[in-house]
């Protein structure tokens, strides 16, 4: 998208996004577009109701990762969208392509899954939570997500490891 706009700044951004979504997410594209629209609407709501603008960086991301910005019903709606995306992926006939697209969608699902675990673990019984944590940890490792945030004060110290966080969540369950 950025490369296209560097070559021609007059291109229609929404058209480029649509084209990217169709090629990258294939049959799941409408659902990932719905997800992107929902995320953008949430950021807009945060800006309008709280005057809060999203910025990159560890300090900003830690301040944003709160239930007031990501209500449970919002995250649940996102997970429903991902369920529809996974169902659509099954329509892809070519197995290799289906697996590639599934992995792309799984990668996109990691952030809302993390937020559900971190902000709303008390909504689930121990068995559900254990399964969610173990699936999240396994998927994160398989998809190459090792850390859930940066630490700009000491980038060589990886205290924000997914494995450490998952172990912390599991310890909170007991057993």
Residue ranges, per PLM feature:
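Catalytic domains of carbohydrate-active enzymes that cleave complex glycans
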Residues: 2-175
């Amino acid at each position: 998208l950025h490369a296209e706009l560097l070559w021609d700044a007059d291109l229609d951004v929404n058209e480029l996004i649509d084209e990217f979504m169709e090629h990258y997410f294939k049959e799941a594209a409408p659902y990932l577009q719905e997800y992107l629209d929902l995320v953008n609407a949430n950021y807009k709501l945060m800006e309008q109701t709280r005057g809060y603008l999203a910025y990159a960086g560890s300090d900003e991301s830690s301040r944003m990762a709160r239930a007031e910005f990501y209500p449970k019903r919002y995250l649940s709606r996102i997970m429903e969208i991902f369920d529809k995306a996974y169902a659509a992926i099954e329509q892809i006939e070519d197995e290799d392509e289906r697996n590639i697209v599934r992995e792309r969608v799984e990668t996109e699902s990691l952030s809302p899954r993390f937020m559900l675990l971190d902000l709303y673990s008390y909504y689930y019984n121990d068995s559900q939570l254990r399964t969610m944590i173990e699936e999240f940890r396994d998927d994160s490792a398989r998809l190459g997500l090792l850390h859930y945030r940066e630490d700009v004060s000491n980038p060589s110290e990886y205290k924000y490891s997914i494995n450490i966080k998952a172990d912390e969540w599991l310890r909170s369950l007991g057993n």
